[in-house]
């Protein structure tokens, strides 16, 4: 539908917690006429087509989360090598080493799950939807946690806008909501898991 079609109106730009690089507005359609040449698929199939697009959208959001988490991890690793406390780099302290190890391990695991879901979708696997839901749920939870842990490693500096961590945390938080909340992802996964033989098929 052309954006300037008669009957389309746009609400105010929302003032969001994060993701301020792209505007968010309400779009209202009132008696909008759409040329038959603009029809995608068959009349009445719009909802079904939109639902098919969700799997790819979920993989996309999962990938966004991986990118933010990787940036946060890189920033935290550099900070641990540079920041000195009690006469040595904070990276020498075992507690922070454990935190960094878990961040990296979880991020690698999330990346592999997202890749697997993308392959399933490309191959039109009948279980692609559940793999996409699992990847979206896992990667966005991991992504937010990695960003949050990276902020914690920076201490008070992580909370200051001079450093990028507070933005990574704000931006990654919405990934757990977009393209279906992670609670909805759990419902999709659980409902499939409760069907006969599901735990043998989905591995």
List each model region and its residues.
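Alpha-helix capping/hinge segments and adjacent helical runs
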Residues: 19, 126-203
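FAD-binding core of flavoproteins
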Residues: 1-74, 78, 88, 181-203
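Hydrophobic faces of stable alpha-helices that mediate helix-helix packing
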Residues: 66, 70-73, 107-114, 143-147
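C-terminal helix-coil-helix/basic helical segment that borders enzyme active sites and/or dimer interfaces
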Residues: 77-91, 104-138, 151-154
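Conserved catalytic-core motifs characterized by acidic clusters
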Residues: 13-16, 39-54, 79-93, 117, ...
